[in-house]
Every structure is written in C-alpha cells, then in structure tokens.
Amino acid sequence: MTASAIAAAPRPGFLARRHRSYYLFVAPALVVVGAVIIFPWLFTVWMSAFDWKIGSVAHFVGFDNYTGLAKNQRFLEAILHTFYFTALAVVVPLFLGLVAALIFHREFPFRGVLRGIFTMPMMATPVAVALVWTMMFHPQQGVLNYLLSLVGLPPSLWVYSPTWVIPSLVLVEIWHWTPLVMLIVLGGLAALPTEPYESARLDGATEWQLFRYITLPLIAPFLIVAAVIRTIDALKAFDTIYVISQGGPGTASETINIYLYLQAFAFYNVGNASAVVVVFFVVILALALLLLYVRQRAQWTG
C-alpha cells in the first residue's frame, strides 16, 4: 500500500463516530416502535398471567388463563370458526382474483373502465360494506332472496341460519377483497417475459399448457403474497362480522376476534382477554411464517 493510500484511508475513530451517528438517526423511530408496539405487547403478556377483571384486584395465576382456554369449549369453537372463515375467505378470492386478472390482462373494448368498476368494492370501508350487506341479507326485504325468487329458488336465511352464517360472511369478503387479489396478480402478469410464450407457441403448445407450465409457475410468488395478505386480513376480521352477525346466531359465527372483544369489553375479563391475544398472535405469526417459507421455496424452485 502506498503512502498516499494510507493517508487517504479513513481513521478508525472517524468510522466509529460515523456509525454512532447512524444510530442517532434511527433512535427516534426505535423509540416510537418500542412505545407503540413492543411495550404494549410485553404488557399484554404480563396481564395474561393475572386473574384481572376491571374494577377488581389483580391476582397472579401464572399459566392458568392459558390452561383455561384449552378447556374452554366456546374458545375452541371460536378457533374452528376462525379457521373455517379464513380458509373460505382466502381460497375463493384467490381463485376468482386469478380468473379476473387473466381476463383483464387481455385486450378488449372498455377494459380500463370495467377494471376500474371491478376494483371499486375494495375502496369502501368494511363497516359501510357490512351495513349494505346486512340489508341485502334480510330474509323478507333483502335483495338476495328477491334475486333467488326470480330464478325459482327458495329463500335463504343467510346470516340468520347457523349453517349458512359463515358462508354468507365469506360472500361479503369475496365481494370486498377479490379486486385486491386481482390487482396483485395483474402486477405479476404485466412483468412476465414474452419470449417463453413465443417459443412455446412455435412448439404447438395450447393455451392451457401455456398457463399450466409458464404463467402459473411465474406468478406463483404473487399468488403467495396475495395469500399472505388475505390470510392475515381474514384472521383479523372483526368489523364486518360484528356489524352483520355479532357472532350469532348464538355463537355460530363467533370468531376469535369476537370472543376477544366480548371477554375484554363485555365481561371485562382483562387477564383472559390478554391470554387470547397472545395465543392469537402466535397463530397468526406461525401461519405468516409458513406462507413466507412456501413463497421462498417457490422462488428457489423457480
């Protein structure tokens, strides 16, 4: 190394001061994250170890709240309702969003206008959507039963039936969030190269073979991203369910979020509600990590 290179090299003390300045710039954001996310989370974990109802003295019970949840039939049913709702609210919009994206990816008259109309539902707030669909689900005056009568089908109780309440709520989710999946997949389709399609067509590949062996593998990462977003959103769904059914009839549509709300703000059982939050967080985190792992595997194999 020449003398000029040695003289031009930064001194260790200067580098240390420069690195410390980086931390100073990041420090305000870290303080906000700690105050808004980390501290409330740690406080929730701490509260879950107490038998604490608002207005009474808290008693330390350790893991009793968690063992109580494992034996609570209503909580276990809420978990099943949550997974049932989530499975339908993820799979169906993914399929319909993929089909819609494939349609709108092609050139046809008024494509831009129709695509804009198709994306309008996702712009509405969940509460507004829920209020509109509540009127549509009405057994006597709702428009859905009127449409069924036009084609000669018997009326349905929709959200007033324990059997059909969750599929009816999923229908709202499908209408509301399928456009989001379509936009994500459209972004993937727009980025696809044209060379593989041209080569495959020269070899005599059919449209189904083009989709099966070229399009689907290439847009798989985008579908997984859409699945992650929809899974987290469906697991967290509260406002739509609460406005339309309040968890009823009975507890037929009571998901973990509805159960949590009732424990915290109806029964004021803060300790039990905190334990539900911790369990639910672990469930969401595990599913998100699983889907992200599948996405990474899809990229590796691709």
Task: Locate predicted features.
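A structural signal for multi-pass alpha-helical bundles of membrane permease subunits
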Residues: 21-302
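Short, Lys/Arg-rich, polar N-terminal cytosolic tail immediately upstream
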Residues: 1-17
